[in-house]
Amino acid sequence: MRSSILETIKDYCLVPQETTVFDGQLCAQINSAFFTLFELGCSKSPFTIEDDTSEWTDFTDNPLLLAVVPDYVQQVVRLKFDPPANSFVVNQMKDEITELTSRISYAVDPGWEVEE
């Protein structure tokens, strides 16, 4: 996985890195996903990106969140930016987003801790 958020999402959405015509639309969808993460309690303030300079570690340094947040953002953006034509695949993606949302909620819950 790339460290740049936008580059990671472009790879996942099969948009060549040199193609910049979709960057604005992708950034808007990425920011929407990050706002949902803010509402879930993943950050103390809303996080946004404007270009390919923002990295995943700019959003969080929590290893639990770094394990699931990129996948969550990829799924949400892909579903909005380029939804699959097959309804089964769409439903599968929605189910995965729901599962990732639950995992993220547990990870940020102050009453839930990983035992070492």
Give each language-model segment a name.
Residues 1-65, 102-116:
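Conserved short "hinge" loops at termini or chain/domain junctions
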